Amino acid sequence: TARYRALADEYDVTINLRPVYPLAIREPNFFERNHPNWMRYTFLDMFRVATFHGIPFGPPRPDPIVQDVATRKIAADQPYIFRLTRLGQAAARRGKSLAFCHEVGKLVWGGAENWHEGDHLKGAADRAGLNLAELDAEVLADAEALDAEIGTNQAALEASGHWGVPTLVFNGEPFFGQDRIDMAIWRMEQEGLVRR
């Protein structure tokens, strides 16, 4: 999300980040049925792209998705991801999902240990201009409606022609992955995108 946030800061464009549950939640057997090298390569590529772009990156501690790495089986008990995704959708209701998800992503994927404890998430919400206590109260009181909105986001993602994240959709055309951001900018410039 760092590169998407930079894109929104640098260009005259608004990015409406629409949170979805990760593929591991939407299709728990996805990882088990893929080639064993798929996960290894995906993580290798994530580290490589982050290093190439100078983005701090480290393994999540803990991973928001509880999974047996050896078998690739997704655990039935998921103590982190539902709260995180609902918080992201609550931020989306306020027009701040990109900022919030970027700040939380820096914690989770930036190597912060125990990002889910103490004031880590509060600090992320503060930096995004949000109040974590307010978001958490909404997550508890309105979980069903938030999940319905997340489901709508997931349907829109699949309707765009892709299933993975990050996917940027412009004029109905999906651009999947960090390596497609420059191509998305190129496409938007063809339609009149200008720098701020």
PLM feature segments, named:
Residues 1-13, 101-196:
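C-terminal cap of thioredoxin/glutaredoxin-like
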